[in-house]
Amino acid sequence: MLTLLTNKTYEKERIVYKCGQNNLKTKPQLLTNYIPIDKNNKNAYNKRKLDSDGFHDFSIYIDYTNINLEITRYRLTKYKSLFINGFNRVISTLESLLKVKTLNYAYTISNRQIQELGIYNWDTKLFGDSAAKRGYNTDSLGLDLIIFGKFLSSSELGESTLAAAAAEYVDVDTQQPVFGIVYLNKDVDYSLINSKEYFESIILHEFTHILGFDINYFLYFNYILIQNDKFGIQRYYINSPRVVNVAKNILIAIILLVLN
């Protein structure tokens, strides 16, 4: 079970949620024709292609179209800022982190992970070409990863599950995720989540699934979140041996800066 630690400053009792990753049964599609071309630089793909020891500027974009509609549909409007601001702050954190010199394994999704990590439903054609491919793969957007938000019920995600996420489409040449979905549980009582740090730590964890980090290092929240009681407030940042070896100081500085 994936345990979520709460901020004691905001909540008197500990709330425990699961990550619904194991409930996602399907797999992503390998894109053989995906070439992210920058509007002003047609050679951008060559710069973005991952090398074993090269620099890599990673650009992330969230399509809020669907999640905005569902926030209204499921009467979650009063929590909209929690969702939107949480996603945006996590993206800024990841983009800052991923501009440092990285190792190839941080983004490479193995064949095993492709089978286990994915969520695209070939039978129901969930989202299908109309949503996941609406120009993203051929237009000159100059983006590396597009993330799509969606709400599911507890019966679909699992009881006590707060969120789940995975890559939908993966570039066949680089094994780089190019489109992913974050699922949020529409049945959760979000009034219990009073801390933005609390929610952002969840989204940060889910984004690691889309990026394809080794599942062994991101299985439990309390494995990847280190508590810092400075000034009497609990704060969290990613702590993975594979990430820390590359960007420990930058990572800590970025996360703590964002959460201040």
Task: Give the positions of each predicted feature.
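Extracellular zinc-dependent metalloprotease catalytic-domain scaffold
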Residues: 1-204, 210-260
